[in-house]
Amino acid sequence: ADLHNKDRALVLTSGYVANEATLGVMSKILPGLVILSDEKNHASMISGIQRARCDKIIFNHNDLYDLESKLKTLPLDTPKIIAFESVYSMDADIAPVEKICNLADKYNALTYIDEVHAVGLYGPNGGGVCEERNVQPDIINGTLAKAYGVQGGYIAADKTFIDAIRSYAPAFIFTTSMSPVLCAGALASVKYVKEHKELRMMLQVKSEELKRKFIDKGIPILENNSHIVPV
C-alpha cells in the first residue's frame, strides 16, 4: 500500500489471481457496472471481466479518442471502470496513463490499472508508471514476482474497496494465504528495490543495448518505449 500511496493492499497468490478475483466481483460491489476494457488487456483481466457478468465495452488499444467516444455513450451516473495496463507485455508499449485518468475524471469513471510489468522498474521508489508520472488511479494491480523475484500478486486501493474485495472474492476467501516466509521475502525485496534506484536505471540501459544489438544483427523488434524487448 505504501509503495502506491494507497490506504490498503490485499495480497493474493499471484498477479493473475489478483486480477481475476478483483475484476470478477466488481459488479457485486457496483451494481449496474459497465467495464471499459483495452483490447490488449492480459488474459487474467479478460477472465475477471467475463466472471463479473456485467456490461463490458472494448476500446481500441491505447486509443484515447475511441475510449472517450465510448464513455460519451454512458450516463454520468452509471458506475463504470476503465481497465487497462501500464506496460503491455506483448507489444511493450506504455499506456497514456495520465490522459486515461483525466478521461475517467471527466466522465465519472473509476480506473483499474495492471502495473505487473512496471512495479519495481519505474518511478522513484519502483511504484510503477503511475508513480513515475505522478498519477493516482483508483485501483492498482501488481505482482511480487517479476521485478521482485518472489511470488504472489496484490491490489492496492482505498480501505473501503479492499474490505469489499476481501469479503466477496472467492479466490481470496477459499484458499490458503501466502506463507510467512514468502511474505517476508517479498517485503524485503520491495524495500531493497525501493532503496536501489540504480537497478532500475541499469535495466533500462541493458534493455537499450539489447535492442541495438538485435537491430545490428538484422533481427526485427517492435519499437517501443519500455524495457521489454519484443522480437
Predicted regions and their residues:
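Active-site phosphate-binding strand-loop segment of PLP-dependent enzymes
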Residues: 57-113
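Short loop-beta-helix segment that forms the pyridoxal 5′-phosphate
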Residues: 1-21
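Helix C-cap/helix->beta junction micro-motif
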Residues: 52, 106-107, 217
